[in-house]
A protein has these predicted regions:
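N-terminal glycine-rich phosphate-binding loop and ensuing alpha1 helix
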Residues: 2-57
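Conserved beta-loop-beta/alpha segment of the NTase-like Rossmann-fold superfamily
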Residues: 75-155, 159-162
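Conserved N-terminal catalytic core of the sugar/cofactor nucleotidyltransferase
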Residues: 36-100, 112
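Short aromatic/basic micro-patch
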Residues: 28, 108, 151-152, 183, ...
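Conserved alpha/beta core of the MobA/IspD/sugar-nucleotide pyrophosphorylase nucleotidyltransferase superfamily
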Residues: 2-5, 159, 165-212
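Short beta-strand segments
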Residues: 12-14, 53, 102-103, 134-138, ...
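A short acidic, helix-capping loop that chelates divalent metal ions and anchors anionic groups
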Residues: 18-22, 142-143, 192
C-alpha cells in the first residue's frame, strides 16, 4: 500500500505529424508554439517531475529555451518513447509511485484538469498499487463517455511499460486490465481533442478565441 503519490509526467513528442504536413508541436496556436500549451497544463506542483521525449532537434531547442527537461532520441516506436521517458524520470526520481503520459497536441487541456486527474490517482492509490487513470467526458447523448489522454499508471505497471510490444503504447495495458482502469470525468470534451491536421488545429484555436 502506498502512503502518498509521487507522480512524474512524460510528454510524448516523438510523432512524425504525417497528417499535419509539418511538426505540429511547433505550429502556432494562439500566438505560441502548440507545445507550450502542454507545458502550461503540466506546470503543477502535484507533479514531481516531467520530461519531453522527442525525435525533433527543434522541439529539443524549444524545451531547453523554456527550461523544460527534454530527451532527444532516434528510435521509431511509441513503446520506445514510453520506455525512454519513464527510464529518464526514474533515474532522477526512483521514488515515483505513478507516471502520466500526455501527448503534446491537446491544446485545450487545462492544468486544473491535470490536477483533478492527479488528485483522483493519489486518493485511489492509498488503497491499491495497481491502478490506471484516464480522462473521460460526455459524448453527446450516448451512455458511454469519450475517453482519452492523459493516462496515468501506478508503479505496479512500470515493468510492463518497459516491455510494451513494438510500436505500441500504454493503451495495450488498458485493454489488458480493463477492471483496473478508472475514468476521471470532466465536463468539457474538447479538452480531449488533439490536432492531427491543420484544420483540427484551426478549429480548436477558433474555439479558444470564441471563449475568450
Amino acid at each position: 500500500m502506498q502512503m502518498h503519490a509521487s507522480t512524474g509526467c512524460v510528454l510524448m513528442a516523438s510523432g512524425l505529424s504525417t497528417r499535419f504536413g509539418s511538426n505540429k508541436l511547433l505550429a502556432p496556436f494562439d500566438g505560441q508554439p502548440l507545445l507550450y500549451r502542454a507545458f502550461a497544463a503540466t506546470d503543477t506542483p502535484q507533479l514531481s517531475a516531467r520530461i519531453v521525449v522527442t525525435r525533433s532537434a527543434q522541439v529539443q531547442a524549444l524545451c531547453k529555451a523554456q527550461g523544460v527537461p527534454v530527451l532527444l532520441h532516434a528510435l521509431p516506436g511509441r513503446n520506445d518513447t514510453v520506455r525512454l521517458g519513464l527510464s529518464a524520470l526514474l533515474a532522477q526520481h526512483p521514488e515515483l509511485t505513478g507516471c502520466m503520459f500526455l501527448p503534446g497536441d491537446q491544446p485545450l487541456l487545462r492544468r486544473a484538469t491535470v490536477d483533478q486527474l492527479l488528485t483522483a490517482f493519489a486518493q485511489t492509490q492509498k488503497e491499491t498499487e495497481r491502478v490506471i487513470f484516464r480522462l473521460g467526458a460526455p459524448a453527446g447523448n450516448g451512455p458511454d463517455p469519450l475517453v482519452g489522454s492523459p493516462v496515468l499508471f501506478s508503479n505496479g505497471f512500470f515493468p510492463e511499460l518497459f516491455t510494451l510490444p513494438e510500436g505500441k503504447g500504454g493503451s495495450v495495458l488498458l485493454h489488458k486490465y480493463p477492471t483496473l482502469v478508472h475514468t476521471a470525468c470532466i465536463a468539457q470534451p474538447e479538452e480531449l481533442a488533439d490536432t492531427d491536421t491543420p484544420a483540427a488545429l484551426a478549429q480548436l484555436e477558433a474555439l479558444v478565441r470564441e471563449k475568450g
